[in-house]
A protein has these predicted regions:
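A short, flexible loop at the N-terminus of ABC-type nucleotide-binding domains that lies
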Residues: 1-3, 12-25, 56-61, 77-81, ...
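Conserved hydrophobic segment flanking the Walker A/P-loop of ABC-type ATPase nucleotide-binding domains
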Residues: 30-32, 85
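The feature captures the beta-strand-to-loop junction immediately N-terminal to the Walker
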Residues: 39-41
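Conserved ABC transporter NBD signature motif
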Residues: 62-74
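ABC ATPase NBD coupling module
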Residues: 73-91, 117
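Q-loop/switch helix immediately C-terminal to the Walker
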Residues: 96, 103-117
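Conserved ABC ATPase signature
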Residues: 109, 145-149, 153
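Conserved ABC ATPase "signature" region
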Residues: 123-140
Length: 157
């Protein structure tokens, strides 16, 4: 099953010399269970691509088509996208993600806070443990504070 399909995606910014295309006519398809890594030189459009997909491109314009689980997500309202997709089904790990952890809360407390903000009503302990183990971390990590983790561990959290 096609999970994410990006077709003809272009993202541009305006400049005094005209439009600057940070992403130009990108196509890719991800099947359910697949993942993708985006690599490239500084300022080549990696972050712009991600921001375009999650509809958070500030000061730019995006065209093309992005379908998630068969639904075109560029054409739906901002509130529908927020309620149904952004941070629920589609997320982005930003550069410097390690800096987003709150130093005064344990890793588990931070997971709990996120689940509460998203009105999760299931088994907190189970979903948190499943998330941690899915990135090859173990349960004792949940009792630690961010400064007690290595850089790689923070990035996986």
């Amino acid at each position: 099953m096609v999970f994410l399909k990006v077709n003809g995606l272009s993202s541009r910014y305006s400049s005094s010399k005209g439009p600057v295309y940070a992403v130009d006519d990108v196509d890719f398809t991800l099947e359910d269970g697949e993942s993708i890594g985006i690599a490239g030189e500084s300022a080549c459009g990696k972050s712009t691509l991600g921001l375009s997909i999650i509809r958070m491109l500030s000061g730019g314009k995006t065209q093309g088509d992005i379908s998630f689980e068969g639904e075109s997500i560029l054409d739906i309202s901002e509130s529908d996208f927020d309620n149904k997709y952004r941070w629920k089904k589609i997320s982005m790990i930003f550069q410097g993600a390690m800096n987003s952890l709150d130093p005064v809360f344990t890793i588990k407390e931070q997971f709990v806070e996120i689940l509460k903000q998203h009105h999760f009503d299931g088994d907190f302990d189970k979903v948190i443990l499943d998330a941690i183990t899915s990135v090859s971390l173990n349960e004792p990590v949940l009792k630690k504070y961010p400064h007690e983790l290595s850089g790689g561990m923070k990035q996986r959290v």
